[in-house]
Structures are given as C-alpha cells and as structure tokens.
C-alpha cells in the first residue's frame, strides 16, 4: 500500500474499513491500561490526588497542538502537492482537534481550581490554548462558509498554515505578557522531571489518546469522502431532473404562449 | 513600479472619499474610546491606567472594521480579477493595497491618538508612547488583517468571519504594543525590548501577509 | 476501585467524566454521520444514479 494508492478514495475507503476495527481495539486496550495505571498512581506530595487530572489534561493539550500539525501537513498537501485526500484529512481533523483542545481547557480549569483557587487563570499556557481553541473554531467556520469543498479546502489550507506559523509567536507573546503581569501564583507540575510512577501512566494515556485521534480521524475521513460522493450524486440527480423537466416543459411552453396570445 | 504606485494612489483616493471608509475608522476609534468610560466608570486614575490598553483596543477594532473593504469593493466591481490577471506579481499588488490601506486608514488613527489620550487623562509622554507603538504596530495589524480579508473575499457575509479569523493573529501585536506603552508609563520594564519585538512582528507580517493573501486570492477566485 | 481521591474528588471525577462525555459525543457524531451518509447513498443508488466512472453509488469496496 504505497502513498499513491492512498490517493485513490475508493482504495482509501477499503483500507479504512479493514484497519478501523484494529485501531479501535488497540485504542480501547491502551485506554483501559492507562486508566488503570492512572487510578493506581500515587498521590503527589503537593497536589494530592488531583494530580490524576494531569493524565487527562496533558495528553489532550499535547494532542491539540499535534492535530494542528497534522492539519498543517495536510494543508501543504493541498496547496503544494495537490494530494487528492489532503483536504479531506484537513477538514476531518478540525472538529476532533477542537474537541481535544476544549478538553485540555476544561480539565486545566478543573485542575486549576484546587491548585490556584480559581477556575480560570491568565496563565501563559492556558491563554495560548484558549487562543488555539478560537483558531480551531474560526477554521471550522471557514470550512463551512464556502459551498464547494475544494475551494473551501484551499482557503482553509492557507489559514491553517498561517496559524501554524503564528502558534509559536502566540506562545512566546503570551509568555512574555504573563511574566510582565506577574501571575498570582506559579503552577508546579511536580518539577520537569516527573517521577516514573507519574511518567508511565502519562505516556500510556498520551499514546492511547493519540491512537484515539487516529481512529476517529480515519473514520471522519471516511465520512467526509462519503459526504462528497453524496453531494456529487445529488447534483447529478438534480441536473437529471432539471434536464428531463426541460424536455417536458417544451410542450408546456407552447401552451403558455398560446394562452398569452389568446389573452 | 508605476503600476504599483498607481494602485496605491487609486486605493488611497478611494479610501479618502466619503464612502471610502478611512475616516469612518477614526470615527469608530473615537466611539470606542468614548464608550470605555461609560463601562469602566469616570475614575480618571483608573482611566489613565487603562489608557494605553483602551487606545490599542480601539485602534485594533477600528482597523479590523475597515479591513473588510480592502478587497471586497474591488471584488464587487471586478477590478480584483483585473489585478489578479495583470503582470505585476499578486504578492506585490496585495502589499501595495495594504500599504495604501495603512496610509489612508491607519495613519489617521495614529494622528487621532493624542486627542483621544486627553479624553483618557493620559499625559504627553504616555500619549507619545502609545502613538509610537501604534505607528510600529498598525502595519502588522493591516498586513495580517489582509490575510483574513483575502480569505473572506469570496464569502458573501464574510465580514464577521474575517474578524474571527484575524483576531487570534493580532493578539501578539496587541500584547507587545500595550507592553511597550506601559513600559514607558509605569516603568521598571524596558521599552526597547517589547518595542523591538513589535517592530519585528510588523516586518514579518510585511512579508508573510502579502504571500498568504495572494495565495488565498488565487485559490479563492478560481 | 476504592481509592481516596482526597478533598477535591469531585474535580477529578468531573474531569474524567467530561473527557468520557466529549469522546462519546465525538464517536456518536462520527457513527451517526456514517449512517446518514450510507443511507443517502443507498437512496441515491435506488433511484438509479451512477457515478461518473459508471460504478454504482453503493460501491462497497
């Protein structure tokens, strides 16, 4: 199965149908292992049991950026290499990435309440992720604003790439802005070198969520291909009806002109 | 070169006409600044603390408002197609249009800043600092906003979508613009660092903006 | 699984529950969308439309 084969939508659909059950199974297994390990993880010295939120929060935060990276590569595929399935990949990834970003924000907020005493904190990381979430929503709006999927694809591709350039800039700016305004408290994750008892569940959950993304993404791509097929078939059907009604209308036109003439 | 200068002159002339939108931007700027005390309260001390932020926010929103028409008017009367098809590279044409827009719509905002600074109880130094940062930062706003305008040009109700697309891109400019102004007013932080980053953002947008806008136009107008 | 989740247990549970809910919504949307598209394709196939390549709408790979 070379990359060229993947360019053919029908073959791609065949591939997904074969691969999806395995991916789904692997995702479920890894999620189960990860959840089990998270439950068994010890309490943090400072944070207590709330450190368990990290096992959901960090993978989602990581994925929110990873998905934008995937969309950026897909956008390059659309603009530079004109790969037929690139825009399908980009469009399918956006809602999934937005959902992960939302989860990162929500769990970050729920983690923050015990830690900082407030649900929202204009911390550099939370703020950058919030802006990323806004960008996801803007991108999804752009996809749906243009009727023709392939034209929408090109506009969305440009926006995705501009956003990719802008994300490091935003992170840096917000970091600067944050140090300028001296946050009320500084978030500690137990240090940058995580203890193994935290690191392993975290990595397992990260891999599990990544597999989840791949599974959902392939399934969503399949849906998008089918949706485009439906659209083109519906257009064919509509033109067929219009054509046949034109043929039938020919005689009706004569009658109409006769009536007008009579009147 | 003459094609580009003709484009710039044409755009400026159109923008400065009554329906052109350049001076409307200043009016909107004034409106936003006037509305702020109604929301925040007439406490002059508070207003002068918020002053740079209010001015920057007003300038950001005002330039967003006028960016909508950067390509829309040309698209409607067909001249955008002519520009796309002409021999001058589309990137340079986009840069020229953005420059014209900044001259016609951005500069008046900067000129209006000292007057509005008075309304917000800002002293000369503060107002000067804000005006200087606006001078350095509004090109960034215009050139990145142009990307959103180009993306939205083929959409009929594109205006609001364009604002949503452009705002995340303008956040760094806003952050550093206000940081630089505050550095002059409040003090311990240096002015130079955020100001040079602001200039850097503008310079980068001078390059990326036209390329991204041209790509959007090319793909969107097929 | 009895473990003490400490004084902030509700936050931990809400986080995991929210994650489960969002993932469930994603899966649900994808599954429903798939069913909707295949239903449309079946209806189009029944009305005799073929794709440009001549293959039927319900081309089951």
From Swiss-Prot, chain B:
One of its GO terms (cellular component) is plasma membrane. One of its GO terms (biological process) is cytochrome complex assembly. Belongs to the CcmB/CycW/HelB family. It is found in: Cell inner membrane. The keyword Chaperone does not apply. The chain crosses the membrane at residues 20-40, 44-64, 102-122, 134-154, 160-180, 195-215. It is a multi-pass membrane protein. This is Heme exporter protein B. InterPro entries: Cyt_c_biogenesis_CcmB, Cyt_c_CcmB_bac. It comes from the Bacteria. Keywords: Cell inner membrane, Cell membrane, Cytochrome c-type biogenesis, Membrane, Transmembrane, Transmembrane helix, Transport. GO terms for molecular function: heme transmembrane transporter activity. Required for the export of heme to the periplasm for the biogenesis of c-type cytochromes. Its main location: membrane. The lineage of its organism: Bacteria, Pseudomonadati, Pseudomonadota, Alphaproteobacteria, Hyphomicrobiales. It holds the Pfam family CcmB.
């Amino acid at each position: 199965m070379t990359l060229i084969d993947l360019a053919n939508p029908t073959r791609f659909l065949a591939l997904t149908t074969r691969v999806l059950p395995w991916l789904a199974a692997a995702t479920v297994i890894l999620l189960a292992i990860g959840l089990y390990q998270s439950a068994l993880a010890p309490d943090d010295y400072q944070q207590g049991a709330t450190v368990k939120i990290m096992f959901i929060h960090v993978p989602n935060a990581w994925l929110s950026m990873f998905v934008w990276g995937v969309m950026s590569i897909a956008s390059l595929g659309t603009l530079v290499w004109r790969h037929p399935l690139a825009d399908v990949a980009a469009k399918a990834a956006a809602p999934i990435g937005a959902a992960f970003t939302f989860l990162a924000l929500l769990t970050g907020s729920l983690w923050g309440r015990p830690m900082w005493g407030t649900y929202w904190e204009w911390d550099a990381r939370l703020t950058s992720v919030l802006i990323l979430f806004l960008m996801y929503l803007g991108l999804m709006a752009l996809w749906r604003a243009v009727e023709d999927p392939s034209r929408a694809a090109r506009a969305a591709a440009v926006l995705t790439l501009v956003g990719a350039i802008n994300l490091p800039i935003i992170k840096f700016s917000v970091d600067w802005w944050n140090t300028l305004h001296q946050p009320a408290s500084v978030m500690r994750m137990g240090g940058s070198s995580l203890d193994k008892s935290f690191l392993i569940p975290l990595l397992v959950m990260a891999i599990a969520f990544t597999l989840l993304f791949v599974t959902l993404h392939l399934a969503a791509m399949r849906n998008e291909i089918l949706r485009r097929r439906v659209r083109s078939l519906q257009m064919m059907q509509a033109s067929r009806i219009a054509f046949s009604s034109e043929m039938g209308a020919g005689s009706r036109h004569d009658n109409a002109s006769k009536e007008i003439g009579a009147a | 070169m003459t094609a580009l200068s003709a484009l710039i002159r044409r755009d400026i002339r159109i923008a400065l006409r009554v329906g052109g939108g350049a001076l409307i931007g200043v009016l909107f700027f004034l409106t936003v600044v006037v509305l702020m005390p109604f929301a925040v309260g007439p406490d002059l001390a508070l207003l002068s603390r918020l002053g740079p932020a209010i001015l920057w926010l007003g300038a950001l929103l005002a330039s967003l408002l006028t960016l909508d028409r950067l390509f829309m008017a040309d698209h409607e009367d067909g001249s955008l197609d002519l520009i796309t098809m002409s021999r001058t590279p589309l990137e340079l044409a986009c840069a020229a249009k953005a420059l014209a827009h900044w001259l016609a719509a951005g500069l008046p905002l900067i000129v209006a800043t000292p007057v509005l600074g008075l309304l917000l109880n800002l002293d000369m130094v503060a107002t000067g600092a804000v005006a200087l940062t606006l001078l350095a930062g509004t090109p960034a706003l215009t050139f990145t906003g142009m990307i959103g305008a180009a993306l939205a040009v083929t959409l009929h109700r594109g205006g609001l979508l364009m604002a949503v697309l452009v705002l995340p891109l303008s956040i760094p400019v806003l952050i550093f613009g206000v940081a630089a102004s505050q550095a002059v007013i409040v003090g311990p932080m240096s002015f130079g660092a955020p100001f040079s980053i602001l200039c850097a953002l503008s310079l980068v947008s001078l390059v990326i903006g036209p390329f991204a806008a041209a790509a959007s136009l090319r793909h969107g107008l097929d | 699984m009895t473990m003490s989740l400490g004084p902030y247990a509700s936050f931990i549970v809400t986080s995991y529950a929210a994650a489960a809910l969002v993932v469930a919504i994603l899966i649900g949307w994808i599954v429903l969308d798939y069913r909707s598209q295949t239903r449309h394709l079946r209806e189009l196939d029944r009305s005799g439309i073929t794709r440009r390549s001549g293959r039927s709408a319900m081309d089951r790979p």
